Amino acid sequence: MDVLYSLAKTLKDARARIVEGTLYTNVADIVQQINQVINSINGSTFQTGGIGNLPVRNWTFDFGTLGTTLLNLDANYVENARTTIDYFIDFVDSVCIDEIVRESQRNGIAPQFDLLRQLSNAKYKRINYDNESEYIENWNLQNRRQRTGYLLHKPNILPYNNSFTLIRSQPAHDNVCGTIWLNNGSEIEIAGFDSECALNAPGNIQEFEHVVPMRRVLNNATVSLLPYAPRLTQRAVIPTADGLNTWLFNPIILRPNNVQVEFLLNGQVITNYQARYGTLAARNFDSIRISFQLVRPPNMTPAVAALFPQAAPFPNHATVGLTLKIESASCESVLSDANEPYLSIVTGLRQEYAIPVGPVFPAGMNWTELLNNYSVSREDNLQRIFTAASIRSMIIK
């Protein structure tokens, strides 16, 4: 994997810098690196493809080295160099694709494609190494079972979950109290509702709680908390728990009270915030507990009082909501996030070439299903194929 990254980095730089009219002295270093690549791989033959609909392709390397000149690079020089560079880029791209579409239940962090294993041969160690990539650095650490670390922007750590639970309900669902939530990616929306607007709750205060487990520990997270849940606080037709009927959710928005957000690690509270909105910070956690209250307004104008009558029927649902977003965090495990297209690259290639479902990943690389059972085997394989995807992304930009 190191050789593949170094190849890609060298080729990317060469493609960008070796252009017509450039002084040779300004690109002499990258020309020497390209020549080192050529000398290392010349005489080798490789084969890619042969899995799913990925076509078999044979690769033969017999290229002359790039020459030197005292003048600017002319069109002939650049055309000759580009022919070599483009062939090598196509080769690296094919190797990346082959690695991305393979998986293994055992030692999934190690290269699975025979060709990539061949590139670890001592013959290719002369290729100029450049291991500045975060993915390459972490791949090397994981390969040695040492601690890794990824800085993530809006990490996709929460499996999709949209549901509700009722604290109180009537058969006709004309007097209900409960919570409704939507968890996905890096966002949690939670709303508490009560047809009676806490009329019969102790002290006219209805309490709600929502606990969200993470699939991995997050560290040094920046989190935002806002006192509303826009996706949930709209009129909606909701199925009953048994799925045999539906009921009308008709929310009237109130502001939540006594909001408390606790970040826990192994069941212990690490960071706790009370009655605070905006930007929060959490040191490390593997679950989040959110508690809040719906307080019946002690004084109401006639228009408001008409919304929340003292007796049935109760046409509306007094509703309070919160939105929590994990804006950034570090994690020892590889995850997809808002900054990187690697999950899309991996999923797209597997669909394009009709790669059969293997022993590790769910069909279609379903992210929710993958997270719900994020095993060590899945993590190892995901780190390897995301590393290959990061290399491919670099050369096809």
Swiss-Prot record:
Protein modification: The N-terminus is blocked. Sumoylated with SUMO1 and SUMO2. Sumoylation of viral proteins seems to have a positive role on viral replication.
Residues that coordinate or bind Zn(2+): H153
Any GO CC annotation of this UniProt entry: viral envelope
Matches recorded under SUPFAM superfamilies: A virus capsid protein alpha-helical domain, Viral protein domain
Gene Ontology MF annotations: host cell surface receptor binding; metal ion binding; structural molecule activity
Chain intervals for the UniProt region annotation (Interaction with the inner capsid protein VP2): 62-73
Subcellular localization(s) per the UniProt record: Virion
InterPro entries listed in its UniProt record: Capsid_hemagglutn, Rotavirus_A/C_VP6, Virus_capsid_a-hlx_vir
Entry keyword set: Calcium, Capsid protein, Intermediate capsid protein, Metal-binding, Ubl conjugation, Virion, Zinc
UniProt-listed GO biological process terms: fusion of virus membrane with host plasma membrane
Residue sites binding Ca(2+) per the record: N266, D286
Transmembrane residue ranges: none
Main subcellular location of this protein, as a coarse class: virion
Residue ranges of coiled coil: none
Superkingdom to which the source organism belongs: Viruses
Quaternary structure and interacting proteins, as annotated: Homotrimer. Interacts with the inner capsid protein VP2. Interacts with the outer capsid glycoprotein VP7. Interacts with the outer capsid protein VP5*.
Miscellaneous section: The VP6 trimer contains a zinc ion located at the center of the molecule. The zinc ion is not essential for either trimerization or transcription activity of the DLP. Zinc-depleted VP6 has an increased sensitivity to proteases.
Annotated HAMAP family: Rota_VP6, Rota_VP6_A
Cited function: Intermediate capsid protein that self assembles to form an icosahedral capsid with a T=13 symmetry, which consists of 230 trimers of VP6, with channels at each of its five-fold vertices. This capsid constitutes the middle concentric layer of the viral mature particle. The innermost VP2 capsid and the intermediate VP6 capsid remain intact following cell entry to protect the dsRNA from degradation and to prevent unfavorable antiviral responses in the host cell during all the replication cycle of the virus.
Family to which this protein belongs: Belongs to the rotavirus VP6 family.
UniProt-recorded name of the protein: Intermediate capsid protein VP6
Source organism (scientific name): Rotavirus A (strain RVA/Chicken/Ireland/Ch2/1979/G7P[X]) (RV-A)
